[in-house]
Amino acid sequence: MALQSEEKLEVGYSSLQPKTRKWVLLMLRVLAFFATAAATVVMGLNKETKTLVVATVGSTPIKASLAAKFQHTPAFVFFVIANGLASIHNLVMIMGDLFGQKLDYKGLRLAMIAILDMMTVALVSGGVSAAAFMAELGKNGNSHARWNKICDKFETFCDHGGGALIASFAGLILMLIISVMSIIKLLIKPKPDSTIVVP
């Protein structure tokens, strides 16, 4: 049974040459970095101010300037923090792949990378899920709880938030693939060298 599972592992990602595997993983990390960084920047700069009529006294409208900012919603703040941390994680892993090949302590490097990748997937998943829930609430409201929708008044704010969500979901999918590849890399045992060197 164990032999069959090892054979299955050797068919996909592991059947690639080690150098090709390294570059595939590196390119996925670069794409994930750009996706999560874009989500962080777009949501972090998301703000819209509008002047709306809030009441009418006689025939005179009373206007007020209202602002929609990502800081007003804790779920969006968590989204920015989660994607920012994922961007930093990916940047550190890219630097480690390029320059840190000799930084391995008793073979723990691959295990730590796999654990950190899984933690990052969980963090981004939580952030994007919370933000998606609040975005849906802002778009459609909730008539049972008497929460009004705001996207009919702050269209640009909602459009930018939607773009940030798309980028973050793309980053999450890439991070899931990276996490699977890290675990496979951890499980694959290097094949023993069959050449014998005689001194």
UniProtKB/Swiss-Prot annotation:
Highest rank taxon of the organism: Eukaryota
Membrane topology: Multi-pass membrane protein
Extracellular topological segments: 44-74, 134-163
Ranges per topology, Cytoplasmic: 1-22, 96-112, 185-199
GO CC term (a single one): plasma membrane
Intracellular or extracellular location(s): Cell membrane
Chief localisation class: membrane
Cell membrane listed as a keyword: yes
Segment forming the signal sequence: none
Pfam families: CASP_dom (PF04535)
Membrane spanning residue stretches: 23-43, 75-95, 113-133, 164-184
Family indicated by similarity: Belongs to the Casparian strip membrane proteins (CASP) family.
Subunit structure and binding partners: Homodimer and heterodimers.
Protein name: CASP-like protein 1B2
Protein species of origin: Populus trichocarpa
